[in-house]
Swiss-Prot record:
Residues annotated for ATP binding in this entry: 169-176
A GO-annotated cellular component: proton-transporting ATP synthase complex
Catalytic reactions of this protein: ATP + H2O + 4 H(+)(in) = ADP + phosphate + 5 H(+)(out)
Lineage: Bacteria, Bacillati, Bacillota, Bacilli, Bacillales
Sequence similarity: Belongs to the ATPase alpha/beta chains family.
EC number(s) from the headed UniProt entry: 7.1.2.2
Protein name (database record): ATP synthase subunit alpha
Length: 502
């Protein structure tokens, strides 16, 4: 076959004309030192603060310390394969995580990568992890209740949508249980929940995920897990990743509940990173900006005004104390940032009062505006009753001669404590809470033995579901308190069929 020279030259000419020279210029640096999840890099002179850099094996790092001769980078992943002299290149982008509806029902790490073995997450939307909090004029005051389903909280320390309410207490006092119960109670409420597990055992995270799955709560929940075995940088960024995922829903007019479990471990991880980066230590060896670490996170929880869609993020940060010391550095910081705290006491927990909420030291700075009218009316005197009972209880230990008024106060107090007890993973609808608290405050439980109170409440709830549906529906739908006559009739009717124990 004859090859024509003209055809070859024409073909070559067309190929050369269509050739585009593509070159990309990237800043490249060299690893000077590596260890404990920190790398010192020489040569990345133009790197931005918080920029992602890429190591030769594909592992990413976060530029934290920008110094004259080197850059301190925290490594977001395994660093065993990185050695001195390795090449590092800039990516030109700051850290982002995937966001969107596709994340609901999944368990992801702080980088947004799935760790539940259910395949990739098909979302193309991302948001930067570090973002300025919503401005003052874009917010609205908190005026809408977020029902936790826990009587002691909804009655005494109510939480509103857009609020930051701290859960604080020693280890093993039921902090996570309160948070999980609140997530369970958001079923059918149109709230997206995000549970951020920081520095917990893998087995604990797995147990909590299973609890949510069995209750059907994973249908509206995202779990962000940075377990104890992960490098410190992942524990440090986990809460920011969680709130970034939540902001996507908030700016689309939805309500979000986010739980940070717990910020003590995040602060410890940040302290570790700061000391390794040779930043000067301050009180309790924490760096000087540990307040800003938590304030910039918690300020991102907000209730947006109606022009921006009226969405909200409600934050429940958890802090673990040592021997009830709430005056330590991190607890005092977070107490000053949040809109109130739920203080759990180990003494109460071990004496069988669960949830072990200390009503005297717990407070909600939003208060009554985060309660439905019915609850506000029936629970108005509850805190004072409980406080006076605790005071009288300590005096009553010293003498047996009590006047009738004091004795009746003590008896009412015992019943109040009993009513506020609640089993875990059994959140109670607000209409049932109003019913039992009305019965308590109006004296209907005064003639019921203390040992029967829990049974009385359970049976009253079952009875009301079939015999007082109008009353319950009115509370649920209007939020107002029905006529006292309706309550009195219903409770008296039930008491006729209730049998006290001998």
């Amino acid at each position: 076959m004859a090859i024509k020279a003209e055809e070859i030259s024409a073909l070559l000419r067309s190929q050369i004309e269509n050739y585009e020279s593509e070159m990309s210029v990237t800043d490249v640096g060299t690893v000077l030192q590596i260890g404990d999840g920190i790398a010192l890099i020489h040569g990345l002179n133009d790197v931005m603060a918080g920029e992602l850099v890429e190591f030769h094996n594909g592992v990413l790092g976060l530029a934290q310390n920008l110094e004259e001769s080197n850059v301190g980078v925290v490594i977001l992943g395994p660093y065993a394969g990185i050695t001195e002299g390795d090449e590092v290149k800039r990516t030109g982008r700051i850290m982002e995580v995937p966001v969107g509806e596709e994340l609901i029902g999944r368990v992801v790490n702080p980088l947004g990568q799935p760790i539940d073995g259910q395949g990739p997450i098909n979302t193309t939307k991302t948001r930067p992890v570090e973002k300025k909090a919503t401005g003052v004029m874009d917010r609205k005051s908190v005026d809408e209740p977020l029902q936790t389903g826990i009587k002691a909280i909804d009655a005494l320390v109510p939480i509103g949508r857009g609020q930051r309410e701290l859960i604080i207490g020693d280890r093993q006092t039921g902090k996570t249980t309160i948070a999980i119960d609140t997530i369970l109670n958001q079923k059918d409420q149109g709230t997206i929940c995000i549970y951020v597990a920081i520095g917990q055992k893998d087995s604990t995270v797995r147990a909590n995920v299973e609890k949510l799955r069995q209750a059907g709560a994973l249908d509206y929940t995202i779990v962000v897990a940075a377990s104890a075995s992960e490098p410190s940088p992942l524990l440090y960024i986990a809460p920011y990743s969680g709130v970034t995922m939540g902001e996507e829903f908030m700016f689309n007019g939805k309500h979000v509940l986010i739980v940070y479990d717990d910020l003590t471990k995040q602060a410890a991880a940040y302290r570790e990173l700061s000391l390794l980066l040779r930043r000067p230590p301050g009180r309790e060896a924490y760096p000087g900006d540990v307040f800003y670490l938590h304030s910039r996170l918690l300020e991102r929880a907000a209730k947006l005004n109606d022009d921006l869609g009226g969405g909200s993020i409600t934050a429940l940060p958890i802090i673990e104390t040592q021997a009830g010391d709430i005056s330590a550095y991190v607890p005092t910081n977070v107490i000053s940032i949040t809109d109130g705290q739920i203080f759990l006491q180990s003494d109460l927990f071990f004496s069988g009062v669960r949830p072990a909420i200390n009503a005297g030291q717990s407070v909600s700075r939003v208060g009554g505006s985060a309660q439905i009218k019915a609850m506000k009316k029936v629970a108005g005197t509850l805190r004072l009753d409980l406080a006076s009972y605790r005071e009288l209880e300590s005096f009553a230990q010293f003498g047996s001669d009590l006047d009738e008024f004091t004795a009746s106060k003590l008896e009412r107090g015992k019943r109040t404590v009993e009513v506020l007890k609640q089993d875990q993973n059994k959140p109670l609808p607000v209409e049932h809470q109003v019913l039992i608290i009305y019965a308590l405050t109006k004296g209907y439980l005064d003639d019921i033995p203390v040992v029967d109170i829990t049974r009385f409440e359970d049976e009253l709830n079952h009875w009301a579901e079939s015999n007082a549906t109008e009353l319950l529906n009115e509370i649920r739908e209007t939020g107002g308190l029905p006529d006292a006559e309706k309550f009195d009739t219903a409770i008296n009717e039930f008491k006729k069929s209730f049998s006290k124990s001998e």
